[in-house]
Amino acid sequence: MAIQTRFASGTSLSDLKPKPSATSISIPMQNVMNKPVTEQDSLFHICANIRKRLEVLPQLKPFLQLAYQSSEVLSERQSLLLSQKQHQELLKSNGANRDSSDLAPTLRSSSISTATSLMSMEGISYTNSNPSATPNMEDTLLTFSMGILPITMDCDPVTQLSQLFQQGAPLCILFNSVKPQFKLPVIASDDLKVCKKSIYDFILGCKKHFAFNDEELFTISDVFANSTSQLVKVLEVVETLMNSSPTIFPSKSKTQQIMNAENQHRHQPQQSSKKHNEYVKIIKEFVATERKYVHDLEILDKYRQQLLDSNLITSEELYMLFPNLGDAIDFQRRFLISLEINALVEPSKQRIGALFMHSKHFFKLYEPWSIGQNAAIEFLSSTLHKMRVDESQRFIINNKLELQSFLYKPVQRLCRYPLLVKELLAESSDDNNTKELEAALDISKNIARSINENQRRTENHQVVKKLYGRVVNWKGYRISKFGELLYFDKVFISTTNSSSEPEREFEVYLFEKIIILFSEVVTKKSASSLILKKKSSTSASISASNITDNNGSPHHSYHKRHSNSSSSNNIHLSSSSAAAIIHSSTNSSDNNSNNSSSSSLFKLSANEPKLDLRGRIMIMNLNQIIPQNNRSLNITWESIKEQGNFLLKFKNEETRDNWSSCLQQLIHDLKNEQFKARHHSSTSTTSSTAKSSSMMSPTTTMNTPNHHNSRQTHDSMASFSSSHMKRVSDVLPKRRTTSSSFESEIKSISENFKNSIPESSILFRISYNNNSNNTSSSEIFTLLVEKVWNFDDLIMAINSKISNTHNNNISPITKIKYQDEDGDFVVLGSDEDWNVAKEMLAENNEKFLNIRLY
């Protein structure tokens, strides 16, 4: 009798159960979401049930025994490889350099010699790798379970069935029991070709005598694949054949009842403590929720396949919505299999910790989920509601909100693991089990922390895009040079805890290299502004810290007058810093490119208030980060000219602590980099000196080792001191050493000459490269300007000076830049920029300004 059955193109465990009718497929989504999941939905119990049903065939018993033995060996080898991997990771973390062959791994039994030999089973060879070689995590995945099995478990039923089917002959025996009138040849052999020939005969027999088509059948490759999805295809066909002969094979339900009775007899309830009972309850909850999670992933996989088959969405868009879904399902099925096995043994014999140790590398599969989750949700909101679905197309998920809930499942599950492991640890009474659970807790916390960090980074990326459009004038800074955005919040800032000093609220953004302060733009400017006092300066402003550019050049910030503000002592950003410079918003060409490339960014922030850029504090010059009792951080900073402190007051202590730990880590990392740089410089200098000395006078070096050591120590200390002085001098204006640079062409102005400049004037030292001269060198000349002049007056004076010098034979001036105190040339293109330059000169008691014309 031919069995007419049809399998879904997307393989899942639920396909092993009776197929739903057409009306049941279109049930509301909440029924799919809330559908109860039992042990019959678990691959572990499905395989155990099939194995039990196959045992009724006496001809299969020797093949089942052989499959059991090969699965046991694979489990031992997996245990050995995992122990090697963990041992070598420990050696690497401790900085050791010993051969890993010295390790003594903890295995489930003593059959290491069997596992480390060359084996040939059912035509498949397993060759042990070099013990000293570090195995990849993919190479440690030899069975369909993760980690190390409990000592009372030799193998899992899933791996055993996989090894059974790879022998080929058992499939032919199954076929002959169902269709005895069309018997297939049964050849027991360890020759791989013979095994594949038997599998091929089985597939042809199913096509011819059971009316299977190619889509409903599996391939020879599926039988030998190390994949749960491909194994499920084989299980579907095997179970269909068994269900076609109820007189030979007992039903699934009856078999399950027999198995439950055997388990109850094997694990008769004993007198146990309350702690033990609580532990067992937590394990049951762990397994039940994991079954539900795997089932939800399979629902998503079916929905993904339906979308692909309907041509409503591209494969690229599908990957954005369901990244690594197939790999995640395969991993989580194996994870669940291991949980099911551990749940069958006593808590003292469980290896939950080993499960997490093996799985921690595979949890990285979820990185695309955490990174692209927000993008997927946005895509659903903007795209799926536009798609028209025919009445004939009935999706297993037909509600956008419920689909979003399914997409959140992976991240939610990963964040749930630490809570479950923590509960197990609290109820654990075995010392060995406790140690492994502690390791599992650390791993699960790191996983959840990594997921949250990825989501935070993704969200911060969107915040930076919005910030770019919200700021009215970036005053010459380039946001791409700030590093990654770490935190942002609305924070109150002051210089003391005194209630007499007013606090001012700013939007503060913490980047890797800089802290930026913003205030919201209002229609009426407030008359009062925040003043951050300095300890060693009479100026009522906050000096910015230092940050080095790619060449190690220092940068020091200063005050800048607030846009459209006439007389306020506001905190302002420097318009300099090569490592944190942004093209000036006054540059028309830059503005045009920015506007064209970021129109979407402005749309993102259309409903949010615009921001004024008010101040910056460089991470490089932060000294101390001290949490205060009133939800505040006391931040001290120091430069070569001045030092100071300010308070950031947050809304709650948790936010303060996050900022505090982040800032302290940034300072710590920066100091480590500086130490490594100094150490590298010292080592290079010492090595060079020693090598030179050895080449010049090898005899002296050999005969006077004390002198050599003394010189080496001196050189090292001198190099360290020199590096330290260089770091301290980072706040000074840098000097260009290139012969063609502007700085090398101009002469320093003496103090007498500087004092001769009137207080109301500023001396411009102008460098101008006139292209009409067909020369690459710059011409240098000076111009005395008045402080009361506006920007237009400056342009007229400069043009007049150049015209008189070159008899009107000049190229048009397209851009003007001035040199700030950091040594960087910043655009001078408006009255505001001119005011900033004058403030810089006044703050540094300078009367001359270097200018470049373009």
Swiss-Prot record:
Name the GO cellular-component terms.
Answer: Cdc24p-Far1p-Gbetagamma complex; cell cortex; cellular bud neck; cellular bud tip; cytoplasm; division septum; incipient cellular bud site; mating projection tip
PH domain sequence ranges: 478-668
What InterPro entries does this protein map onto?
A: Cdc24/Scd1_N (IPR010481), Cdc24/Scd1_PH_dom (IPR033511), CDC42_GEF (IPR053026), CH_dom (IPR001715), CH_dom_sf (IPR036872), DBL_dom_sf (IPR035899), DH_dom (IPR000219), GDS_CDC24_CS (IPR001331)
Q: Where is the Calponin-homology (CH) domain?
A: 135-246
Nucleus is among the record's keywords? no
Name all PB1 domain ranges: 761-854
Q: Where is the composition biased (Low complexity)?
A: 682-707
BP term (GO), one:
response to pheromone triggering conjugation with cellular fusion
Entry's PROSITE patterns? Answer: CH (PS50021), DH_1 (PS00741), DH_2 (PS50010), PB1 (PS51745), PH_DOMAIN (PS50003)
**SMART domains linked to this entry:** CH, PB1, PH, RhoGEF
Ranges annotated as biased composition (Polar residues): 1-14
What UniProt keywords apply to this chain's record, in alphabetical order? Guanine-nucleotide releasing factor
Q: Where is this region: Disordered?
A: 1-24, 542-571, 674-745
Task: Please provide, alphabetically and separated by semicolons, the GO molecular function terms listed in this UniProt record.
Answer: guanyl-nucleotide exchange factor activity
Asked if the Swiss-Prot or TrEMBL record annotates the protein with the keyword Transferase, the reply is no
Cite the DH domain residue spans from the record. 278-454
Additional detail: Present with 1010 molecules/cell in log phase SD medium.
- What does this chain do? Promotes the exchange of CDC42-bound GDP by GTP. Controls the polarity of calmodulin, and the calcium regulatory process of bud emergence. CDC24 may be involved in the initial selection and organization of the budding site.
Subunit comment for this entry?
A: Interacts with AXL2.
* Record's protein name: Cell division control protein 24
What is the species listed in this Swiss-Prot or TrEMBL entry?
A: Saccharomyces cerevisiae (strain ATCC 204508 / S288c)
Q: Which classification does the entry list for the species?
A: Eukaryota, Fungi, Dikarya, Ascomycota, Saccharomycotina
Which gene is annotated as encoding this protein in its UniProt record? CDC24
